[in-house]
């Protein structure tokens, strides 16, 4: 929450950042997960802080080495596998690509970041393999690869894709109720134009969106879509998108 406040306060003002932090701290899902001793909240914190650090690195033109970001990525990798490292890199890479950075430069830069963030986890995995042997290796394969492919040897939190929508809506109580009530008091405009026109306006809107809002939107969309792919779905898997949803909710409430 403090990292999110600092990130948005520098770029969007203290009022919006404070409200964003308050919403993040007080929604049902974050509060519930934060009071339980589980790895999911730690994973979310490390992934979100890695996203903030990689964004700052992008602001600097990918110059230098984002050591703090690499440490966060390494910690996320150790917490719950390579997905903790891959998703922040994916979000930031897509953001920079949309903003016109050359694909080759993005690829090489994030390849280096990815390899650097694998050093500490590799040391731990080697040590764990020396103790656990083939049984440990099979567990890693099942949890990190077969879970995504839906080929685990046992059923684990299998739910349909719409389950994620339900958990986010429920998890953001009481703010989802506030948003739903506010819909009755908004002024609506008549919908007009063809579907192609809507698509063109949407593309223009995305291109003209300021950097912070676009980065926050991509963090929500890409992480959410990724966690809709595997059969295994839990509400805590989506915790990394909650600070970014809080940013848009804060904008909406101030509006």
Model-derived segments and spans:
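Membrane-integral, polyisoprenol-dependent glycosyltransferases
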Residues: 1-254
């Amino acid at each position: 929450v403090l990292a999110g406040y600092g990130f948005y306060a520098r770029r969007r003002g203290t009022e919006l950042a404070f409200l964003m932090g308050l919403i993040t701290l007080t929604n049902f899902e974050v509060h519930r997960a934060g009071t339980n001793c589980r790895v999911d909240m730690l994973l979310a914190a490390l992934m979100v802080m890695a996203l903030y650090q990689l964004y700052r690195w992008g602001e600097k033109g990918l110059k230098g080495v984002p050591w703090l970001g690499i440490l966060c990525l390494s910690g996320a990798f150790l917490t719950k596998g390579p997905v903790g490292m891959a998703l922040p890199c994916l979000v930031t890479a897509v953001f920079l690509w949309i903003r016109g950075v050359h694909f080759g430069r993005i690829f090489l830069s994030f390849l280096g970041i990815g390899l650097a963030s694998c050093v500490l986890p590799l040391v731990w995995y080697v040590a764990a393999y020396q103790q656990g042997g083939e049984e440990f290796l099979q567990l890693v394969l099942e949890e990190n690869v077969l879970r995504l492919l839906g080929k685990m040897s046992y059923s684990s939190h299998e739910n349909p894709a719409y389950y994620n929508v339900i958990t986010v809506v429920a998890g953001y109580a009481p703010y989802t109720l506030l948003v739903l009530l506010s819909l009755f008091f908004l002024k609506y405009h008549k919908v007009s134009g063809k579907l192609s026109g809507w698509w063109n306006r949407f593309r223009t809107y995305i291109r003209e969106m300021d950097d912070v809002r676009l980065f926050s939107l991509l963090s929500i969309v890409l992480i959410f879509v990724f966690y809709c792919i595997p059969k295994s779905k839990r509400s805590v898997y989506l915790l990394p998108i909650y600070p970014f949803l809080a940013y848009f909710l804060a904008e909406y409430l101030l509006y």
